[in-house]
Amino acid sequence: MSNKFGVITNDIQPIGTNNKNVENIKNRQDGLDFIKTLKDSIQDVNTEQQTSEKALADIASGQVKDLHQAAIAINRAENSMKVMLEVRNKAINAYKEILRTQI
């Protein structure tokens, strides 16, 4: 069927029925899952903190073999904790922003 503009309207599909691409995107899992990445990051921070605590205990007991490596371990743990806290703060701010959004 043609209208006055010469466009065949029978071939035009409604927007809702042509969602094959959307389904393909939903079913694809190419990247890492966000929750898994977050858990791995928290585990890494925990490992850094444990290494730092061991280095501090070795310094306190006089068993430290390399003071420079102990200082590096402590600094790494401090930096990883700062990054994790910053990620937490950003997540909390994003959550608060979503709560303020009016529908």
Curated annotation (Swiss-Prot):
Swiss-Prot/TrEMBL keywords: Bacterial flagellum
Say where the protein is mainly found.
other
> Which Gene Ontology terms of cellular component type are present?
bacterial-type flagellum basal body
Instruction: Cite the GO molecular-function annotations of the record.
Output: cytoskeletal motor activity; structural molecule activity
What's one GO BP annotation on this UniProt entry?
A: bacterial-type flagellum-dependent cell motility
Record localization: Bacterial flagellum basal body
Tell me one Pfam family matched here.
Answer: FliE
Concerning InterPro entries, the annotation shows:
FliE (IPR001624)
Source organism superkingdom: Bacteria
Per the similarity annotation, which family is this?
Belongs to the FliE family.
**PANTHER family listed in its UniProt record:** FLAGELLAR HOOK-BASAL BODY COMPLEX PROTEIN FLIE (PTHR34653:SF1), PTHR34653
What's the protein called, per UniProt? Answer: Flagellar hook-basal body complex protein FliE
